[in-house]
């Protein structure tokens, strides 16, 4: 299902291949025979964004986190389809990674869409494995494209998730006043 979805999104002259020779299939975007003279624009963009990496240094590029609401929803769905889990009852979802930065980026992405997220760390180094970061997510929108996950999603919240930034617009330019409180960090509640 993911393979078909990605294939349909590719520009003309490209196709998606799967190498199943390893325990974890590797997907590659390759040029079709009639497009061999051109540079692979997907590989060029992956390199430009610094995404040609693996393992515990993966991340979400800043420009992706600052995309439109629709782009950020699609990003979350792509991440959740490939690395997300959903409980049998459909009310608990999480994203698992061995990259601390990617876990923090997913948390930030969820917050930007009005959801709640928290990261739990599981140290599996004593078993010869990496540290695992599990991002527990609560969000109103359905974060899945995959049918088996999408149909099971049944969010239940103890409190409403309402924090999100829809847009930022210039209002006016004017003088501002700065307030400070007599404490070492100068913080206060309003």
Task: Identify the residue ranges that each predicted region occupies.
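Internal intein/HINT superfamily modules and their associated LAGLIDADG
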Residues: 1-190
């Amino acid at each position: 299902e993911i393979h078909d979805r990605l294939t349909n999104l590719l520009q003309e002259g490209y196709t998606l291949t799967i190498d199943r020779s390893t325990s974890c299939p590797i997907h590659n975007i390759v040029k079709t025979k009639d497009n061999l003279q051109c540079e692979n624009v997907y590989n060029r963009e992956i390199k430009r964004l610094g995404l040609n990496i693996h393992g515990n240094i993966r991340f979400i590029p800043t420009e992706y986190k600052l995309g439109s609401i629709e782009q950020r929803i699609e990003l979350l769905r792509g991440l959740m389809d490939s690395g997300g889990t959903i409980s049998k009852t459909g009310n608990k979802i999480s994203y698992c990674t061995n990259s601390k930065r990617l876990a923090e980026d997913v948390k930030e992405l969820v917050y930007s869409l009005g959801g709640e997220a928290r990261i739990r760390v599981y140290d599996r180094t004593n078993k010869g494995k990496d540290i695992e970061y599990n991002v527990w997510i609560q969000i109103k929108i359905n974060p899945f494209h995959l049918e088996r996950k999408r149909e099971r999603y049944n969010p239940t919240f103890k409190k409403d998730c309402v924090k999100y930034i829809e847009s930022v617009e210039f209002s006016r330019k004017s003088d501002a006043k700065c307030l400070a409180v007599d404490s070492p960090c100068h913080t206060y509640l309003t």
